[in-house]
Structure formats: structure tokens, C-alpha cells
């Protein structure tokens, strides 16, 4: 598509950023809706982040997604921060407005939307969240807001204890994760375990409650060992790519004025891009 002088511009800021599938995702939506706009990968080093964000706003960009390592630094450049970002402790979506920069975090809402797309009610029962990083924080607080009782479990207990204290959540030791499955309706892996090039997550799904939903936010590979084991036992498996797609919806709507749909065609397009 040839852009006009009125094209809307957005992008994803990271360092590095070449691995991001967000340009493929947003590009598909732009083409689908015939929008005069573009979504660009923007490799910006940490020392240049604040100055570059200010420059993008002055250049007329509508906004940007923010990924590693900038999610915490994005707080400092915002004039207004949504409660989702405040509770998650990180910003992943910037919207440039005439009155300043607005920051939000869509990881939690994207995770919940992906659960519901798989027929899982986030408030159906207690949820066990493995991990205590930024994604765990966003997902745990979103589940809590949706009505679930949330239990945290992390390899390094200090972060999980702090997060549990901040939001009134339950914390259990890492060694108790498999035994705890029987008491939960949902388990979520927010760690890097199971990601390509990392060790698999060791979790004994034989101890899972019948009908348990097993979610993994890892999307490379699309089918992690955890999800494969869940499917083999007849449990509900919720893959990470869907979360990536759903969390992108609010930003696209804010920047380009159209609320896009996450459907099978979009999933296949981004999945094909992931598999090269």
C-alpha cells in the first residue's frame, strides 16, 4: 500500500526488536481494513528511549507498543497512566494525544480475552500462576479483578512473596506446584520454561483436577511441552499466541480508529510467520 501524507503511523519499540511479530499482526489488520497507515519496528537503545518517544510524538505518530527492555521505563514518559499499567507495574501501549502521552498495559486483558476465546471462564475457580515477573503481575491482577482467587508460585520466592503481599494473593513454594494443581481450575505458565532454547517446565499434570485449563504465554514454539501434555490428558490447552493477538486490539483501535477482530485467519497468518 502506498501511504498518503495523511497516513497514521505507529510501531513497536524494543531493543532488539527484529524478532517481534507485532508488525506482521498490525500489518494484517491494516490491509484487512484498507487503512492508510503503517506499523513499524523501532529498535531504540535504553539510553535513547525517552528522547525517541518524545520525537515520535512530535513527528505525528499515533502511538507505539513497548516491549523488552522498555516496559518499566515507559512509565516515566507518560503524562497519564491507566490503572492496568499501574497495577501491572509496566506499560506496553503508548497513545500520543494532544494533551500528552497515555500509557496502558494490555497483557492482562489480552490474557483474559484469550481464555474466553477458548471457552474458559476466568472466575470459574482458583488460578495458579507460575512466575512473578511483569507478565505474571499483569495476569495475576487481571484474574483477581475478574473474580478468581489467585495463587502465586515462583522459582525465586522473594518476588512472589512481594507480589502476593502487594495484592493480597496466596503464595506457595515452587516445590509445591504440582501438588497444588488438584485445588485449582486454571494453571498459567508465565515463566520462560518451555520456550525454544530453554528447559521445559516440570509439572505433573496427572495431579490436575478434571477439566482444568492449562495456559502458557510462551508462543515459540506454538505448542509447548506443557500444552502438549495438557492436550494428551484431555485438559483445556490455551496457547500463548492468542494472548499476543488479543493484547494488540486496544492499541490498534486507539491508533487507527478501528477495533480489529482476532480470528482464525489472523492466527494462521501470524503462526505461519512464526514458523518462517
From Swiss-Prot:
One of its GO terms (cellular component) is cytosol. Transmembrane segments: none annotated. The active site is at residue 71. One of its GO terms (biological process) is shikimate metabolic process. NADP(+) binds at residues 83, 131-135, 217, 240. Shikimate binds at residues 20-22, 67, 92, 107, 219. Pfam families: Shikimate_DH, Shikimate_dh_N. One of its GO terms (molecular function) is NADP binding. This is Shikimate dehydrogenase (NADP(+)).
Amino acid at each position: 500500500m502506498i501511504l498518503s501524507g495523511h497516513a497514521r503511523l505507529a510501531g513497536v519499540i524494543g531493543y532488539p526488536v527484529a524478532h517481534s511479530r507485532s508488525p506482521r499482526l498490525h500489518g494484517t489488520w491494516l490491509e484487512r481494513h484498507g487503512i492508510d497507515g503503517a506499523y513499524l519496528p523501532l529498535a531504540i537503545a535504553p539510553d535513547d528511549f525517552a528522547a525517541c518517544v518524545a520525537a515520535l510524538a512530535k513527528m505525528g505518530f499515533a502511538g507505539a507498543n513497548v516491549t523488552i527492555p522498555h516496559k518499566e521505563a515507559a512509565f516515566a514518559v507518560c503524562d497519564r497512566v491507566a490503572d492496568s499499567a499501574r497495577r501491572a507495574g509496566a506499560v506496553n501501549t503508548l497513545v500520543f494525544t494532544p494533551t500528552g502521552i497515555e500509557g496502558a498495559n494490555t497483557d492482562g486483558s489480552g490474557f483474559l480475552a484469550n481464555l474466553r476465546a477458548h471457552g474458559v471462564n476466568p472466575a470459574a475457580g482458583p488460578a495458579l500462576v507460575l512466575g512473578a515477573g511483569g507478565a505474571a503481575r499483569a495476569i495475576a491482577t487481571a484474574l483477581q479483578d475478574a473474580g478468581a482467587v489467585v495463587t502465586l508460585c515462583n522459582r525465586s520466592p522473594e518476588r512472589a512473596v512481594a507480589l502476593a503481599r502487594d495484592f493480597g494473593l496466596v503464595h506457595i513454594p515452587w516445590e509445591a506446584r504440582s501438588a497444588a494443581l488438584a485445588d485449582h481450575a486454571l494453571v498459567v505458565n508465565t515463566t520462560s520454561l518451555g520456550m525454544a532454547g530453554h528447559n521445559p517446565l516440570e509439572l505433573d499434570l496427572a495431579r490436575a483436577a478434571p477439566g482444568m485449563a492449562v495456559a502458557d504465554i510462551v508462543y515459540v514454539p506454538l505448542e509447548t511441552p506443557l500444552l502438549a501434555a495438557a492436550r494428551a490428558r484431555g485438559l483445556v490447552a490455551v496457547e500463548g499466541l492468542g494472548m499476543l493477538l488479543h493484547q494488540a486490539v486496544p492499541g490498534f483501535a486507539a491508533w487507527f480508529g478501528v477495533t480489529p477482530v482476532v480470528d482464525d485467519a489472523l492466527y494462521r497468518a501470524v503462526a505461519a510467520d512464526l514458523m518462517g
